Amino acid sequence: MLTGEIPIKIGQMPAKTSPKPRKVKADDPGSLVDWLKAQDDDSLRDLLVHRPDLVHPVPADMAKLAARAATNSSITRVLDRLDAWVVGVAEVIACLDEPFTKKELSALLKEDPELDRALEVLKARGVIWGSDKGMRAVPVLKEVVAPHPAGFGPCFIEERPDLEAVATKERIKQILDKAPKGVDEVISKVLWGPPVLVVDKLNREATTSSAKTPYEYLMAQGVLIATGRHELTLPREVAFVLRGENLLPEDLSKVPEISIKNQRDPQAVDKAAGGAGLHFVQMMEELLDIWGENPPAVLRNGGLAQRDLTLASRICDEDENIAALLAETALAAGLLAADETADPLWLPTPAFDLWRTRTVQERWATLAEAWLTSTRVPSLVGKNEQVRINALSSEVDKPLAPEIKSLLLKALVSLPLGAEPNEDELVAHVKWQRPRREAELIDLLVRSFTHEANLIGARGLGALATTGRALGEMRYTMPSPEARTAAARAAVADPKGHVIKTDPLLVEAIAPLLPDAIDHFMLQADLTAVIPGPPESHVAAELRLLGYQESRGAAQVYRFSESSLKRALERGKDKDEIMEFFKKYSSTDIPQPLEYLLNDLVRQLGSVKITEDPIDDTEPAPGEKRSTVKLRPRPAPEGSPPDAPLLFSAIKALRLSENPKAKVPEVAKSPEPMSPEKLVPFLSEAIEQNQSTTISYAEGDGTIKARFVDPIRVQGGLLTSFDHLELRIRDFALSRINAASITKAKKNGK
């Protein structure tokens, strides 16, 4: 049987879909609403996790949930996240009359054992429902997979009744046996889709005897239908017969294998990854330090000028692609942002100051998490031939990026330790996972992210390291991009009280691969300082101010010169402070040449006494503009799953909507008065402990009412919770809550 690839396209579907009469009587599974009502809480929870758009906002009842689940946009999102086999089965289902049975569908797919998995996935996501003896699909499925579901063309049986005689195994065999040379090649072009051919020279009046080309012969025999002056279409009725026992390509249900290009020593892989991770952290700190002193301007399109990117690459002694990766990762981690002045600049945020105080392992984990969930694609920088794409611009955003990284890591985790994969097969594997996505974009993303994983320390020597496996395994439990952005915003608002959280699994994974940070160095007579390992952050920052870094890596070298020491003195350092730093952290004596150089510079510049500034250090200096660092909004990856409290409350609201006569639980006692500074921690703890609370709330008309609620989240001055009185999820302004307490309700009012 001829084989090929299934094209996935979206468009309008013809009303008549099934080319064959029904042979099996199926049970009617009823409506989607009835099916949803019959599902248990675990099934509903799975549905909402896989389709987060259904709970934003939470529907009022099951009918509204079913209506939203059957919309074009929602079903499109579902199919866009399914693999080629499940998508193919869904498209075949769209070609069948309803209700259909599992037995009927299985017969069309050569009894493929993977059919059970496909049906289970489609049911779990609400695309189809029912039992093996009778199933239906959401009506909009036909529209979403149009115009060529599973590569099929439209049905022509009503327009061309003669097709009934053509679309049989016997007749098709006769036609092909007598066919001229080239017919097989023509059929192979349309059999698996798209089913339309464009032919330059076509005699639409040709008969079997007068046909001069394979196209005209097939048209004359009714195998192809002329649908335009130069257009031929393979009817669905004929395609069903030509494909035989399997309406989908033979190997579509098999996950593409990834061969091993090279087998590396896992310890060598981890060592290389650890070195890359350390280097990435060091480059990030150095770049943001320099941008803190000389911030680049923000372009009108919100990006970074090419000259600034080039300068950044020189600073890091790396190519521009790595400089773009550093800048984009800093933005994603909330360490870099544009300020709000009239002439905005790219500046490190207060979160950067907090980040640099953490251990090198924690700093790496922060960057790795940000990279994994970032929608930024640094490899796009400079790629457009018409208009140059700048780093940090909106053109670098691709919402698909986090999903592809997750799939990529999942594929790499499945390989043996130390395995370097064949990159082309890796690309094909990810494309199979997301066949409806743009193939060219997936190719770019997979190859780019594979390279970036080497640079950030997730891979080493071309193979996945321990760090990369940790990234792959925690992809579903890590903080969402929204949560990390909120954390960075909180750091901007309250840099002293905020703590940036990192995933302990990542810290644990990178820790054995990095040497311990050290707080000493060796001063040399040649005016250099040698650090035999990764330095503590504050030591490295001071050395960068006093000297110029000559080498990076496990051991670093800083060179002091007249210009570097003069720079430090002009920025407020005095001789005694510099000498004290050298004495405290140098494991060797201070060389005389270094001391002489410092003394000469002090005499040249004059004596300057450095004292405490009596002015509040939070106020800008006279004539200095205060700039506010603003975190630019970033698009979150599609379909961030709802958190557990929201899922719990959403299901509760849907259940209670089906029983409107249910009694509101009685509150055991009145809420206790609570000050504003204690309210947020109290509610946060209630959310963490999954506890119901009673709040005293000032309504819009001024009345004070006690509300029995299940808190979900506290964000943006609002408490989102399930309100037992109104049986829905709603927001309460924190400023209107004057009392709160943990509630133990009397069940059923007893």
What are these regions (language model features)?
Residues K133, R229-H230, T341-D343, L527, ...:
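Beta-strand-connecting loop/turn residues
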